[in-house]
Structure formats: C-alpha cells, structure tokens
C-alpha cells in the first residue's frame, strides 16, 4: 500500500479542470501528473452528469509514488441557495435587512442533496441551511397550501 504524503483541497469548476491555476500549481508542488488528473476529473464529471461550470469541492490524496486519488463532493450550500434564488450574492447587511425569502421545502430539497456528503441527519442539515440563509440576509418562510 502506498504511503499518503498529502491532501489537496480545491474547488474546481466541473468539466473545466486544466493545468492553469489553481489546479496546476497545487498538483505540481506534489509532483502529480497534472494532465492525467485533469482528464480523470473532467471524465468523472461527464460520467456523473454534472453540468459544466458547477464548482465541485475536491479532495485529492497524493501518494509517495506520485499517484493520486480524488473524492468529489457536492457544491457548497451557498451555491445551491444562490442558484435557487437566481442571485449572485447575499445581503450586504445580513441581520439588518432581509432582501429575499426562501421556502423551507426548498431548503429540505437542498438538504437531501447535501446529505450525500454528511454524516448528519436531515434535520441537522436543515438547521445548518437555515443558519446559512440567515447569514446571507435571506428569510426562511413556511408556505401553506
């Protein structure tokens, strides 16, 4: 078994891994074959049907023989919230102004996606999501049918 010499954490846009920064320099410092990583990452994005341009948090494990393995995670909570609400950023003064509302059902759907990466139950993930939207100046509402 190869010895692990390090971990590299990067957020890479799906389908767009290339030797340019931040990927190239981070992998080059550890002696990893950059082009091989880029090809494998982009191929895995295609296999998983991840849309191009989605930021994918990636943890790359580098071994002593300069080989690597990597794990892709789901995008950040803020990415999903901004995408759902079609905004580019949160409020400039969160806590003092709420400029948008989000339905609790939408947060539940995001929590279902984030559950893949987490050991937490869905209730805990939803609580975390509520805190995230609050820090972005977004109010959580319950819509009754």
UniProtKB/Swiss-Prot annotation:
GO terms for molecular function: large ribosomal subunit rRNA binding; structural constituent of ribosome. Keywords: Mitochondrion, Ribonucleoprotein, Ribosomal protein. GO terms for biological process: translation. It is found in: Mitochondrion. The keyword Metal-binding does not apply. SMART domains: RL11. InterPro entries: Ribosomal_uL11, Ribosomal_uL11_bac-typ, Ribosomal_uL11_C, Ribosomal_uL11_C_sf, Ribosomal_uL11_N, Ribosomal_uL11_N_sf. GO terms for cellular component: mitochondrial large ribosomal subunit. It comes from the Eukaryota. Pfam families: Ribosomal_L11, Ribosomal_L11_N. SUPFAM superfamilies: Ribosomal L11/L12e N-terminal domain (SSF54747), Ribosomal protein L11, C-terminal domain (SSF46906). Belongs to the universal ribosomal protein uL11 family. This is Large ribosomal subunit protein uL11m. It comes from Reclinomonas americana. The gene is RPL11.
